[in-house]
Design a protein with these regions (language model features):
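Short solvent-exposed beta->alpha transition segments
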Residues: 34, 45, 49-94
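N-terminal cap/lid segment of alpha/beta-hydrolase-fold proteins
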Residues: 132-173
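Cap/lid segment of the alpha/beta-hydrolase catalytic domain
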Residues: 181-241, 310-313, 421-432
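Accessory cap/linker subdomain of secreted extracellular hydrolases
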Residues: 223, 286-373
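Alpha/beta-hydrolase active-site loop
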Residues: 234-256
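Primarily recognizes the serine-hydrolase "nucleophile elbow" in alpha/beta-hydrolase
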Residues: 248-312
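Short beta-strand/loop motif that positions the catalytic acidic residue
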Residues: 374, 380-382
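Catalytic active-site module of serine/aspartate enzymes centered on a nucleophile-bearing elbow/loop
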Residues: 415-418, 424-453
């Protein structure tokens, strides 16, 4: 199987799956799920030629029919006899479409993760632990007795209404309010990844401290297929993906009676943090009180994607020939993006998950420079163990904004990209396999910043 495939598939989403227009659950008749089920059925029957018929060239070379036969021969000894396929769902990570089919064996239940490339060929396959939906584990600093949650709609009456949750302190307001803006990819309102829900941690922690927090579903999660089918997709930029909805969320808070209209803040994580300066300028008429950047990227997105993939492929100490080939393809995509002309803006083709207009819109955008135009308090937060948005990005913010009145910087030595604490070499396992709440010190620093302004 493809080395590091689990890394590539499970863990690219938090910081940079960019425009992954894909919802998590789809109907069983989905074409790729049907293909995945047929692949597994062929394995079960021992028809390895049929199982491999949809393999891409690399899979055929490294895991062709003979290798599949060897692999399947070992399954009964380790897992017990195969019993049946059950539920199926879809996912998308790192540019690959993924079908997950739950398989019951005599000894254990696992998910078959079948990976498809752009030509709908099977580019990878493995069995991974079948994880039930994780029950939310509130951090110790969250006290549900001190706040309540209500369902709201961001952008109600518009073309893209989004369901959200407002965590609001109990008692007499008005309370300061905070809007949470997602990172890359089709995030839910909690920024769920594996057993972790960092936005829910932040919302519950701050609501316990007297601050109302609004989090909402990302447009690309709810309307992914509609966005792609829209004739305007070719002109889609971060404005439609992120900025417009963030400002709608601010408007919703301003219209909520128990919220202090003059003390509404916006927090952006990862891509959301990178876009905070643009959100601030686009929302000047809303008189937003201040802004918080959590792991805000300053480097160009395409180059960052290449750097992340290089890091992930090297996690096991070496980069295989196949992985080097994949990196070469990514480099070519980066070069294509950098060679775009303004006349390419109307093209609908995807280049690293987004149309040319998306990349042209971000060309030349350097967040710290744009932040110099924002005359509001800002808090810049960064984890030292974040390999996706690095301390180099943090230093870029400091170089430009350091010493400016009203701008604060906080670096957390043990924090990863989700601002949970850990030790050792940072890897994606911390996101998908290990539960870790946003660190108490991070939530405390955010609360102090908001409450003093």
């Amino acid at each position: 199987m493809l080395k590091n495939l689990a890394v590539l598939l499970l863990f690219c989403s938090a910081a940079l799956s960019l425009l992954s227009f894909q919802q998590g659950e789809v109907a069983p008749e989905d074409e790729l799920i049907v293909k995945a089920r047929a692949f597994l059925k062929a394995l079960e029957k021992g028809d390895f030629e049929a199982a491999a018929k949809d393999f891409d060239a690399t899979m055929m070379k490294v895991s062709g029919p003979e290798k599949l036969a060897e692999f399947w021969k070992q399954v009964p000894e380790k897992l017990g006899s195969f019993k049946k396929q059950t539920a199926a769902r879809r996912d998308q990570f790192g540019g690959y479409e993924v079908a997950l089919v739950t398989c019951e064996f005599e000894k254990v239940t696992l998910d078959a993760r079948v990976v498809f490339d752009k030509e709908k060929k099977i580019a990878g396959f493995q069995f991974v632990p079948s994880l039930p939906p994780a029950k939310y584990e509130p951090p110790a600093y969250a006290d549900p007795a001190k706040f309540e949650e209500r369902e709201v709609t961001v952008g109600a009456g518009g073309d893209w209404p989004l369901q959200g949750t407002l965590a609001i302190p109990k008692g007499v307001g008005p309370f300061p309010g905070l809007v949470l803006v997602h990172g890359s990819g089709p995030n839910d309102r909690d920024e769920t990844i594996g057993p972790n829900q960092p936005f829910r941690d932040v919302a519950w922690g701050l609501a316990s401290r007297g601050i109302a927090v609004l989090r909402y579903e990302k447009r690309t999660r709810i309307y992914g297929p509609k966005l792609v089918a829209d004739p305007k997709f070719a002109s889609l930029t971060v404005k439609e993906e992120t900025i417009d909805d963030a400002l709608e969320a601010v408007r919703l808070l301003k219209s909520t009676g128990s919220i202090d209209r003059k003390r509404i803040f916006v927090l952006g994580h990862s891509l959301g943090g990178m876009l905070i300066p643009r959100i601030a300028l686009a929302g000047k008429d809303l008189d937003i009180a201040g802004f918080i950047v959590m792991a805000g990227l300053t480097s160009p997105l395409p180059e960052t994607y290449l750097r992340q993939m290089t890091y992930l492929f090297a996690l096991d100490g070496e980069t295989s020939a196949d992985e080097k080939k994949q990196l070469d393809e990514i480099k070519k995509d980066v070069d294509r993006i950098n060679a775009l002309r303004e006349s390419d803006a109307g093209k609908a083709e995807k280049m690293i998950f987004a149309p040319p207009a998306y990349w042209l819109d971000l060309r030349g955008y350097y967040p710290p420079d744009v932040a110099m135009k924002v005359n509001r308090p800002m808090l810049i937060l960064q984890g030292s163990r974040d390999y996706q948005v690095t301390t180099e990005d943090f230093e870029n913010w400091k170089k430009t904004l350091g010493g400016r009145p009203g701008v604060e910087f906080k670096l957390y030595p043990k924090a990863n990209h989700l601002f949970a604490e850990g030790q050792g070499l940072p890897s994606p396992d911390e996101y998908s396999l290990v539960h870790g709440s946003v660190a108490d010190t991070v939530v405390s620093d955010i609360a102090l910043f908001i409450l003093k302004h």
